[in-house]
Design a protein with these regions (language model features):
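Glycine-rich phosphate/diphosphate-binding loops that line cofactor/substrate pockets in enzymes
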Residues: 10-26, 50-51, 124-127, 197, ...
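N-terminal amphipathic/basic leader segments beginning at the initiator methionine
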Residues: 1-8
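Long, charge-dense
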Residues: 56-105, 308-326
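Short glycine-rich or small-residue beta-strand-to-loop segments that form or flank ligand, phosphate
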Residues: 24-35, 58-62, 133, 253-255
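Short, glycine-rich nucleotide/cofactor-binding loops
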Residues: 30-37, 257-267
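Conserved, well-structured core segments that form the ligand-binding/active-site neighborhood
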Residues: 86, 90-245, 276
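C-terminal non-catalytic interaction/assembly regions of soluble proteins
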Residues: 268-326
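Histidine-anchored nucleotide/phosphate-binding helix
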Residues: 34-55, 267-278
């Protein structure tokens, strides 16, 4: 893997000709659910290299709960807590437009035929000299692979974008999505980026890692202003983060780190990330010592408690009958 000095040197080479000209910089960083991403190390290095800049740190939370002072200190020890801004997916967003229904229908092969609203945190439209989006490319149940434009449109997105793209991913079947670079949701993100944020000065710092406990190995770091870095990172993540089994598993035990997983909403990744390996009729045992609620926020928690987890077809019928699910 890459050692810390190699990572620092790569970042310095990528931006050393630019950062003397920067005065306002926005770091877009992951929350505690990505503690093995090496994002904390990278963000702290950037913060130290930019003493002449005003640096704001936007937490790409999506619908997740904001990071506590303690979590920020653990993950980003060199960055003062007052520099962090917790993204609020309900209040902090501006609507830019929508990805047309025709495009959505085409990429989903007709599974979804409605437009996707495009809403992002208003800070992404502020007068920053550079936005540095930092995170890990890893298999994801909605987008196929996490990060790149997803970090802006979901991590820093609004309810309309998050809800529509998650529904699109569900309608397209997780088995066709998980671990793939080219998916219907990814194509929607790419189109939204092309249509609505073509001139935003964003650069991507994308890691591919594996971990045993808290021992993180960085297999690759991809720095780019376009999509090529993501494409290469996704290929490496498929190699490092997807495990193929010789035969289906009849029993599996998953332990959810209590520092990362405090809700069933997040803990369901234990299901998403094992289901293609499980035998029909197999047993999945989930040890979740930190899970204390269903949803990441109060409204989502209420809806899950009211309607439960019922499978795709049943949920679609519920959506037809109940306004609060639309």
């Amino acid at each position: 893997g890459l050692d810390d000095e190699s990572l620092r040197a790569a970042v310095d080479r990528a931006y050393e000709d630019e950062w003397d000209r920067w005065r306002r910089v926005l770091l877009v960083v992951p929350d505690g659910t990505r503690r093995h991403s090496k994002a904390g190390f990278l963000a702290c290095h950037l913060y130290r290299r930019l003493p002449h800049c005003r640096v704001d740190v936007l937490e790409a939370l999506g619908t997740h709960a904001p990071m506590s002072r303690e979590t920020c200190a653990q993950l980003y020890p060199d960055i003062p807590f007052d520099r962090f801004i917790a993204h609020d997916w309900r209040q902090d967003v501006v609507r830019l437009g929508e990805v047309p229904a025709g495009f959505v229908a085409e990429v989903s092969q007709g599974r979804m035929e409605r437009p996707v609203p495009v809403e992002v945190n208003r800070l992404l439209l502020s007068d920053y000299d550079r936005i540095l989006s930092i995170g890990q490319v890893v298999p994801h149940e909605v987008a196929g692979m996490a990060n790149h434009a997803k970090n802006l449109f979901v991590g820093c997105g609004g309810a309309g974008t998050i809800n529509a793209t998650h529904m699109l991913g569900a309608l397209c079947d997780m088995e066709r999505v998980m671990g793939r670079e080219d998916t219907p949701v990814r194509r929607v993100f790419d189109e939204a980026l092309r249509r609505f944020l073509p001139s935003v000065p964003v650069s991507w710092l994308l890691s591919v890692t594996t971990a045993r406990g808290d021992d993180v190995t960085v297999h690759g770091l991809f720095l780019s202003d376009g999509r090529e870095g993501f494409r290469r990172a996704a290929a490496l993540a498929q190699e490092k983060n997807v495990i193929f089994v010789d035969r289906p598993l009849t029993r599996a035990v998953v332990h959810l780190d209590e520092r990362e997983f405090q809700s069933a909403w997040l803990g369901n990744k234990a299901v998403y990330r094992t289901r293609m390996a499980m035998a029909d009729g197999g047993e999945l045992i989930i040890l979740a010592p930190g899970v204390a609620r269903f949803g990441e926020d109060a409204q989502a928690d209420r809806l899950i408690r009211r309607y439960g987890y019922a499978g795709r077809d049943a949920v679609l019928r519920l959506c037809d009958r109940h306004e609060d699910l639309r």
